[in-house]
């Protein structure tokens, strides 16, 4: 959630400095125009558990100065903003006002608006798969794909045989889908051993309980046996279906025949 801009705070007033040509001018005014404005943003994480206030100063579409409540002071983005940053950081009352904006501006507006907002939550879709289809006891990368969820605060953890893995984990971070949902990939670098069970656990505000998806490390022979069993089962179903079809078709044909000699 972002609030833009602050009113009536002078720092949030959008200043448009434009030199207009006189109405009696007969030629096009080629003098330069200048645009300077300030944005005030409130970033909320898990409600108001953590609030970040950002104030950005932009001149001709280039940010030159900002205040970040996580930093606690003004920082120059370009040399143009350095004099103002040094000046305002030397004035305790200005810094105190900016730091207090987390409560006086962000949390204040959140508490008012929260009563009228509908909380949108979308449950994530979780899948687990290896990046390589190679034999066990070789280096591999297990991927936990978490997609189409909202809001963006999510926790993804890897377990091996019930014990949490804390090393060898790589994440893409949050990726915006462009439709108000997010996705992320959390990968575990490991050397799978036969019989090991890897579990990806996902916690999200839309879920009452964590979602867990398992991946079992199996040898090539075990996988072949499983595939053979599945293939045999499917083949058996096909033969059963064909047999039932022939049986019911014959039954229907016999019921349609009437013995000769009946009186009507």
Swiss-Prot record:
Keywords: Adaptive immunity, Disulfide bond, Glycoprotein, Immunity, Membrane, MHC II, Signal, Transmembrane, Transmembrane helix. Residues 122-215 are annotated as: Beta-2. The chain crosses the membrane at residues 226-248. Its main location: membrane. Residues 124-214 form the Ig-like C1-type domain. SUPFAM superfamilies: Immunoglobulin, MHC antigen-recognition domain. GO terms for cellular component: late endosome membrane; lysosomal membrane; MHC class II protein complex. It is a single-pass type I membrane protein. Belongs to the MHC class II family. This is H-2 class II histocompatibility antigen, E-D beta chain. It comes from Mus musculus.
């Amino acid at each position: 959630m972002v609030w833009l801009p602050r009113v009536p705070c002078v720092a949030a007033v959008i200043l448009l400095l434009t030199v207009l040509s006189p109405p009696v001018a007969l030629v096009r005014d080629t003098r330069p125009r200048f645009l300077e404005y300030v944005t005030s943003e409130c970033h909320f994480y898990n409600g108001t558990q953590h609030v970040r206030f950002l104030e950005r100063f932009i001149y001709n579409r280039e940010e030159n100065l900002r205040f970040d409540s996580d930093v606690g002071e003004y920082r120059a983005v370009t040399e143009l903003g350095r004099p103002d940053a040094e000046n305002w950081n030397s004035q305790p009352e200005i810094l105190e006002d900016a730091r207090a904006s987390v409560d006086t501006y962000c949390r204040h507006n959140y508490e008012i608006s929260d009563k009228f907002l509908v909380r949108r939550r979308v449950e994530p879709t979780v899948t687990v798969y290896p990046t390589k289809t190679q034999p066990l006891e070789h280096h591999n990368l297990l991927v936990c794909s978490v997609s189409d969820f909202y809001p963006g605060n999510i926790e993804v953890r890897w377990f091996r045989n019930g014990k949490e893995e804390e090393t060898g984990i790589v994440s893409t971070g949050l990726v915006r889908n462009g439709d108000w949902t997010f996705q992320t990939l959390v990968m575990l670098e490991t050397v799978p051993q036969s019989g090991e069970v890897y579990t990806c656990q996902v916690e999200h505000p839309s879920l009452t309980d964590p979602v867990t998806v398992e991946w079992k490390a199996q040898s090539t022979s075990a996988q072949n046996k499983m595939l053979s069993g599945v293939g045999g089962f499917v083949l058996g179903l096909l033969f059963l279906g064909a047999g039932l079809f022939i049986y019911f078709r014959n039954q229907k044909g016999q019921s349609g025949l009437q013995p000769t000699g009946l009186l009507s």
